[in-house]
Amino acid sequence: MRVALYPGTFDPITLGHVDIIRRAAALVDKLVIGVAINRDKGPLFTLEERVAMIEAECAALSAETGTEIVAHPFENLLIDCARDVGAQIIVRGLRAVADFEYEFQMVGMNRALDDSVETVFLMADARRQAIASKLVKEIARLGGDVSKFVPPRVNDALKERLGRA
């Protein structure tokens, strides 16, 4: 069974993330969405809320692709999380050259820790390259419309959280 891990903070999940999930799911038998617990980032949504948003989006994707897709919170090293969930592959999305430089370093470190886990990069769809959770939150905080960047449920959650419902 081919198992892949797609890690991120997903605060919140965006249409860019959903696109990568859809495409990654087509490549494996099981896709684990690793929801990082990163206290340094000070997330807008709790871990439970982020997991619930991911699960809501992935239910339809799982049915569409025939791939098992599950959310899995983690707080340890990425490579340890990959081992914990039985993943042979780590999936990363790339939007721009700046993403590549960071990811290149991460691949090197992960390989040094465990060279049996492969990293696969999926380029962001051209329509989604500018989307970043950080920017989505900033636009939403300032009263902008983020409905083009996030799933409808997430848009509603942002409005509610930021008092714009």
Curated annotation (Swiss-Prot):
GO MF term list: ATP binding; pantetheine-phosphate adenylyltransferase activity
Keywords: ATP-binding, Coenzyme A biosynthesis, Cytoplasm, Magnesium, Nucleotide-binding, Nucleotidyltransferase, Transferase
PANTHER family named among the record's database cross-references: PHOSPHOPANTETHEINE ADENYLYLTRANSFERASE (PTHR21342:SF1)
UniProt-recorded name of the protein: Phosphopantetheine adenylyltransferase
Catalysis: reaction(s): (R)-4'-phosphopantetheine + ATP + H(+) = 3'-dephospho-CoA + diphosphate
Principal location class: cytoplasm
Chain positions recorded as ATP binding sites: T9, F10, H17, G93, L94, R95, E103, R128, Q129, A130, I131, A132, S133, K134
Protein localization: Cytoplasm
HAMAP family named in the record: PPAT_bact
Task performed by this protein: Reversibly transfers an adenylyl group from ATP to 4'-phosphopantetheine, yielding dephospho-CoA (dPCoA) and pyrophosphate.
GO CC, one annotated term: cytoplasm
Assembly notes: Homohexamer.
Signal sequence annotation: none
Gene3D superfamilies reported for this sequence: HUPs
UniProt family annotation: Belongs to the bacterial CoaD family.
GO BP, sorted A to Z: coenzyme A biosynthetic process
Taxonomic source organism: Ruegeria pomeroyi (strain ATCC 700808 / DSM 15171 / DSS-3) (Silicibacter pomeroyi)
Sites where the protein binds substrate: T9, K41, L78, R92
EC number: 2.7.7.3
Transition state stabilizer (site feature) positions: H17
Taxonomic path: Bacteria, Pseudomonadati, Pseudomonadota, Alphaproteobacteria, Rhodobacterales
Pathway: Cofactor biosynthesis; coenzyme A biosynthesis; CoA from (R)-pantothenate: step 4/5
InterPro entries linked: Cyt_trans-like, PPAT, Rossmann-like_a/b/a_fold
Cofactor(s) this protein requires: Mg(2+)
